[in-house]
């Protein structure tokens, strides 16, 4: 868990072949800011007088962060229209994200997010 209130620690797990897009690594431990730009911009910016609007970090921001910082190839197999592609199951602390508000779920320090592809070639 993070000791800094400006950041949060998350455990990310990939399965069902989705890990192949993320350096073939199933488990990641990441730290993200607790407060993020309202436009989901994940690039590091310096604070200035005209700082952008911010909001608490949610799963939508996390998906953009994963795409911009951990995804190694084939973005189109991970995200579509600002969210995960159909066929990717998202669990938040072992609960289907549809029951948690999907992308609007506000992340908490120590959350575990699991993403599993349910689509397989044949």
Swiss-Prot record:
Disordered: annotated segments: 33-52
PTM annotation, UniProt: C-terminal thiocarboxylation occurs in 2 steps, it is first acyl-adenylated (-COAMP) via the hesA/moeB/thiF part of UBA4, then thiocarboxylated (-COSH) via the rhodanese domain of UBA4.
Matches recorded under InterPro entries: Beta-grasp_dom_sf (IPR012675), Mopterin_synth/thiamin_S_b (IPR016155), Urm1 (IPR015221)
Keyword tRNA processing carried by entry: yes
A single cellular component GO annotation: cytosol
Residues in coiled coil: none
Pfam families: Urm1
Gene3D superfamilies linked to this entry: 3.10.20.30
Family listed: Belongs to the URM1 family.
HAMAP family: Urm1
Annotated protein name in UniProt: Ubiquitin-related modifier 1
Organism encoding this protein: Laccaria bicolor (strain S238N-H82 / ATCC MYA-4686)
Organism placement in taxonomy: Eukaryota, Fungi, Dikarya, Basidiomycota, Agaricomycotina
Gene expressing this chain: URM1
